[in-house]
């Protein structure tokens, strides 16, 4: 069962759930909390590699990822990031989220953006129990026109679901947690699998 708005506010009030900066009451509705777009992005430089062999030797995968991912792009307050049709980019939420060991989060993109062709979170919309950090967004423009994305715009909504018991292996205590504490648009670390 997912938390309703009153429960989300109660979990925020008593510190079991942390969203920084704390969202104002008008951004908590029904069963979700709106999240905004941060100012950090990464893009793929497709011309730098013919392909990535995802099941190849780890070192080769790491080298290919290093070639195809841009350095992090940080936008100023009034700047826009343009996502062109058919392009994939990584971005990050403005908010940092900390989940307790007995709560899982779910991120959904906004329907209004999807209707323009913007996929906000292509896959992996689960936020694990014990998560701490910003949430990396996997943008894809499936529309016909370039889309201007600006830091601070509403980009998605989080919902939360209590677990039957605290997780035995929450994300923040796992040795193999590849994205622990991320604050920027962290590129794929599939080579760490």
Curated annotation (Swiss-Prot):
Metabolic or biological pathway: Pyrimidine metabolism; dUMP biosynthesis; dUMP from dCTP (dUTP route): step 1/2
EC number: 3.5.4.13
Keywords: Hydrolase, Nucleotide metabolism, Nucleotide-binding
GO biological process: dUMP biosynthetic process; dUTP biosynthetic process; nucleobase-containing small molecule interconversion
Membrane-spanning residues: none
Molecular function as annotated in GO: dCTP deaminase activity; nucleotide binding
A Pfam family per the record: DCD
Residue positions of the active site: 138 (proton donor/acceptor)
InterPro entries: dCTP_deaminase (IPR011962), dUTPase-like_sf (IPR036157), dUTPase_trimeric (IPR033704)
Record-listed dCTP binding positions: 110-115, 128, 136-138, 171, 178, 182
Chain segments carrying region Disordered: 171-193
Catalysed reactions listed for this entry: dCTP + H2O + H(+) = dUTP + NH4(+)
Source domain of life: Bacteria
Function, as annotated: Catalyzes the deamination of dCTP to dUTP.
The protein's assembly and partners: Homotrimer.
HAMAP family in the record: dCTP_deaminase
Family label: Belongs to the dCTP deaminase family.
Protein name per its UniProtKB record: dCTP deaminase
Organism name: Edwardsiella ictaluri (strain 93-146)
Source organism phylogeny: Bacteria, Pseudomonadati, Pseudomonadota, Gammaproteobacteria, Enterobacterales
Underlying gene: dcd
């Amino acid at each position: 069962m997912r938390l309703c708005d009153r429960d989300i506010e109660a979990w925020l009030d008593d510190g079991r759930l942390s969203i920084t900066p704390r969202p104002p009451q008008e951004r908590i509705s029904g069963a979700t909390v709106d999240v905004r777009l941060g100012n950090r992005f990464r893009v793929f430089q497709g011309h730098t590699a013919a392909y990535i062999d995802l099941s190849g030797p780890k070192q080769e995968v790491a080298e290919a990822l290093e070639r195809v991912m841009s350095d992090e792009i940080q936008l100023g307050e009034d700047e826009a990031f343009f996502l062109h049709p058919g392009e994939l980019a990584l971005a990050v939420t403005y908010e940092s989220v900390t989940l307790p060991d007995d709560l899982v989060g779910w991120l959904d993109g906004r329907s209004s953006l999807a209707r323009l062709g913007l996929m906000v979170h292509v896959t992996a919309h689960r936020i694990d129990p014990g998560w701490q950090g910003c949430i990396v967004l996997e943008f894809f423009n499936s529309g016909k026109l370039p889309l201007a994305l600006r830091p601070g715009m509403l980009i998605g909504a989080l919902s939360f679901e209590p677990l039957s018991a605290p997780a035995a292996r929450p994300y923040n205590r796992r040795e193999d947690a590849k994205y622990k504490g991320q604050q920027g648009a962290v590129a794929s670390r599939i080579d760490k699998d």
